[in-house]
């Protein structure tokens, strides 16, 4: 099975190859086989990307916003037309089940392009009356923006970052994760087909050194990263040396709080979505599931029953509900956390091992795992695992669970399940997290901002807020009378 692209990079509207760069094999996580081989960007490739972006950006920013938006909306249409093909590519790249990629990856990318393409013409500055004279503000492009992607939602992340940047009149250079480099190239082709001028969306492949080169480049005006907290800290420090704009969408250890009046099936469904979707490789996952003591026994019994029915197997089979983790290193990391959970006294209620799957013995599969009797100080309740490992914790009252939910360095997301809507609002109002749900979990419509508090990030993806993060404000004062000067 092969998925070799035409070349490693996409620059100035064309595929570009330079095999003097470091080789980067692309592995299909379900089988461990190499499906493509790309090459890391050399300094010449990086400079070519900046030259193309610089040449194109000024003319693009000068277009009417509605004209820029029209191209983004055409790109959205192209992604939807090619959704099946793109979803299969994303499954090969990430190992995620096709059942998921058909609805959550290229589809979400299309939603972002459609949203920002439609809203940009109404994103304007302010007018302030000053007693005859007046002032107004203009929202202007930053210039060349850089996006650095993660491996869990490659095409979605590429679009979530590039759509508002391009809508605002910027040029964009995107570096996908070296683990999942393929679908960003497909997005570049879709932009080209839709009529995006050459040089405005460029893709360069590579490892951390390429990311650092982009962050530190003199022409980079802004950096947007989706990744881990340690990576975010490094990139923010580098960007800070040059006072570059940054958006950071980082990790989490988010709480889901289930009160005893909650609809138990909905709460369990939300907890499963918040732990097992994308094989647990979702930054906003609610991996600390706090269940009221009156509901805990029934909740766990039914949760385990439903979890054991999850179908693990061939990701390209649409009946499969869970695929493998992205690579062997990630599986080894998750398995080590499972061992820590057992060693620290948590009860393994379900899963915890590597399933035996005919024809996929070299894949990076792992069973959906549930721990009970988890305490707040255990490693599995403190650190981001990024795999299908759920910790169930018991609580007895509202104030207690709010304090425990907030006792973390992270603040990306949170969820509350309750029949008392007033309590839902009251609790969410006290949770220190940037993206919250009441009686739902992990739904991320592009119309609203997504991002975190504390060490989970800075800035926001999506919603009108994202446009603000890809623009700068110019204030213009207009004097309608004579200048009053004491000199």
Curated annotation (Swiss-Prot):
Cofactor: record remark: Binds 2 potassium ions per subunit.
Swiss-Prot/TrEMBL catalytic activity: betaine aldehyde + NAD(+) + H2O = glycine betaine + NADH + 2 H(+)
Record: residues binding NAD(+): 149-151, 175-178, 228-231, 251, 283, 384
Cofactor(s) annotated in UniProt: K(+)
Sites where the protein binds K(+) 1: 27, 93
GO molecular function: betaine-aldehyde dehydrogenase (NAD+) activity; metal ion binding
GO biological process, one term: glycine betaine biosynthetic process from choline
Keyword list, A-Z: Metal-binding, NAD, NADP, Oxidation, Oxidoreductase, Potassium
Annotated InterPro entries: Ald_DH/histidinol_DH (IPR016161), Ald_DH_C (IPR016163), Ald_DH_CS_CYS (IPR016160), Ald_DH_CS_GLU (IPR029510), Ald_DH_N (IPR016162), Aldehyde_DH_dom (IPR015590), BADH (IPR011264)
Sequence positions that bind K(+) 2: 243, 454, 457
Signal sequence segment: none
Enzyme class: oxidoreductase
Residues annotated as catalytic: 161 (charge relay system), 249 (proton acceptor), 283 (nucleophile), 461 (charge relay system)
Pathway noted in the entry: Amine and polyamine biosynthesis; betaine biosynthesis via choline pathway; betaine from betaine aldehyde: step 1/1
Residues modified as Cysteine sulfenic acid (-SOH): 283
UniProt xrefs under SUPFAM superfamilies: ALDH-like
EC code(s) of this entry: 1.2.1.8
Family label: Belongs to the aldehyde dehydrogenase family.
NCBIfam families tied to this protein: BADH, PRK13252.1
Oligomeric and partner information: Dimer of dimers.
Function: Involved in the biosynthesis of the osmoprotectant glycine betaine. Catalyzes the irreversible oxidation of betaine aldehyde to the corresponding acid.
Protein name from the UniProt record: Betaine aldehyde dehydrogenase
Annotated organism of origin: Brucella anthropi (strain ATCC 49188 / DSM 6882 / CCUG 24695 / JCM 21032 / LMG 3331 / NBRC 15819 / NCTC 12168 / Alc 37) (Ochrobactrum anthropi)
This protein's encoding gene: betB
């Amino acid at each position: 099975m092969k998925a070799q692209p035409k070349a490693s990079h996409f620059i100035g509207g064309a595929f570009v190859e330079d095999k003097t760069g470091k080789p980067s094999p692309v592995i299909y996580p379900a089988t461990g086989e190499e499906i493509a081989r790309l090459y890391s960007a050399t300094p010449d490739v990086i400079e070519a990307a900046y030259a193309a972006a610089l040449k194109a950006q000024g003319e693009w920013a000068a277009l009417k916003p509605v004209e820029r938006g029209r191209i983004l909306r055409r790109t959205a249409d192209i992604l939807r037309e090619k959704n099946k093909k793109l979803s299969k590519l994303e499954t090969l790249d990430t190992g995620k089940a096709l059942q998921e990629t058909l609805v959550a990856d290229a589809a979400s990318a299309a939603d972002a392009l459609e949203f920002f393409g439609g809203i940009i013409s109404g994103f304007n500055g302010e007018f302030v009356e000053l007693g005859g004279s007046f002032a107004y503000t203009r929202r202007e492009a930053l210039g060349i923006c850089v996006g650095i992607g993660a491996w869990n939602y490659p095409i979605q992340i590429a679009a979530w970052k590039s759509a508002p940047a391009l809508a605002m009149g910027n040029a964009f250079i995107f570096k996908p994760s070296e683990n999942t480099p393929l679908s960003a190239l497909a997005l570049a082709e879709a932009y080209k087909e839709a009529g995006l001028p050459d040089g405005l969306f460029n893709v360069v492949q590579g490892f951390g050194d390429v990311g650092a080169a982009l962050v530190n480049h003199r022409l980079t005006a802004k950096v947007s990263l989706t990744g881990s907290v340690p990576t975010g800290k490094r990139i923010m420090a580098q960007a800070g040396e040059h006072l570059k704009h940054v958006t950071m969408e980082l990790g989490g250890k988010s709480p889901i709080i289930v009160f005893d009046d909650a609809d138990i099936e909905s709460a369990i469904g939300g907890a499963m979505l918040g732990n097992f979707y994308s094989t647990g490789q979702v930054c906003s996952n609610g991996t600390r599931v706090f269940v009221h003591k009156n509901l805990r026994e029934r909740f766990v019994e039914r949760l385990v029953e439903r979890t054991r029915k999850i179908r693990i197997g061939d990701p390209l089979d649409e009946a499969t509900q869970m695929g493998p983790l992205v690579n062997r290193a990630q599986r080894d990391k998750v398995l080590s956390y499972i061992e820590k959970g057992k060693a620290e006294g948590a009860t393994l209620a379900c899963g915890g091992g590597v399933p035996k799957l005919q024809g996929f013995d070299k894949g990076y599969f792992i069973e959906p795992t549930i721990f009970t009797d988890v305490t707040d100080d255990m490693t599995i309740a403190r650190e981001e695992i990024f795999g299908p490992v759920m910790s169930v914790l018991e609580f007895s009252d509202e104030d207690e669970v709010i304090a425990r939910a907030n006792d973390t360095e992270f603040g990306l997301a949170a969820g509350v399940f309750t029949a008392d809507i007033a309590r839902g609002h009251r609790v969410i109002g006290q949770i220190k997290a940037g993206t919250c749900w009441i009686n739902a979990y992990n739904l991320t419509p592009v119309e609203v901002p997504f991002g975190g508090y504390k060490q989970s990030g800075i800035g926001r993806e999506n919603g009108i807020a994202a446009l603000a993060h890809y623009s700068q404000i110019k204030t213009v004062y207009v004097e309608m009378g004579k200048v009053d000067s004491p000199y």
